[in-house]
């Protein structure tokens, strides 16, 4: 007799149960996040479906309970296109850095996605400020030109965690020295607190 247990730990199941998906990417515009996605995985497919259908009811329920549901978007460098292992390694490193700095109780990662232009890390946060501060700290150590947090609410504006595009333009126009930047602008903090 094989000793096979059908008992399942619900917490373990939720922690490790991911649904992989593929889709046809659409042209991404400046106001539409995630339409460039062609592959991803998620632990909460209903949240992704609601976002793509522009239905904020689920996100509203989370927000009413003090939970922020969103994702970090960042551009994929040209040299990483088609290199799924390197893309996943970066996402894993970002998750580890956020967890280490913000704490395990601050966030639960739901999965991520790869698009034609951007990578995405999906999560729900109980302490959004700690999560975004941790992400911003990690991202400033990378060479990425920008990274943003966006709620799973399509009509919301992004909160930029990193934006070197202005620095680059300023440096090209004024001086060869890079400009210093703060992690979150006062406007971004107000938006985050309103969530």
What do these predicted ranges mean?
Residues 1-117, 126-136, 140-174, 183-191:
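Charge-rich, low-complexity segments
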Residues 119-124, 195:
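Short cationic amphipathic helices and targeting signals
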């Amino acid at each position: 007799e094989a000793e096979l247990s059908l008992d399942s730990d619900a917490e373990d199941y939720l922690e490790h149960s991911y649904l992989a998906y593929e889709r046809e990417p659409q042209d991404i515009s400046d106001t539409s996040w995630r339409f460039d996605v062609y592959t991803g995985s998620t632990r909460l497919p209903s949240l992704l479906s609601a976002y793509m259908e522009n239905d904020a009811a689920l996100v509203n329920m989370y927000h009413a309970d003090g939970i922020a549901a969103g994702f970090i978007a960042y551009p994929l460098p040209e040299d990483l296109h088609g290199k799924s292992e390197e893309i996943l390694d970066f996402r894993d490193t970002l998750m580890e850095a956020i967890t280490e700095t913000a704490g395990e109780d601050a966030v639960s990662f739901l999965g991520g996605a790869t698009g034609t232009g951007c990578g995405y890390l999906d999560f729900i946060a109980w302490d959004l400020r700690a999560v975004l501060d941790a992400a911003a700290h990690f991202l400033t150590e990378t060479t990425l030109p920008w990274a943003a947090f966006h709620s799973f609410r399509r009509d919301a504006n992004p909160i930029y965690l990193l934006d070197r595009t202005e620095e680059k333009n300023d440096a090209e126009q004024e001086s060869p020295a890079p400009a210093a930047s703060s992690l979150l602008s006062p406007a971004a903090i107000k938006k985050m607190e309103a969530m």
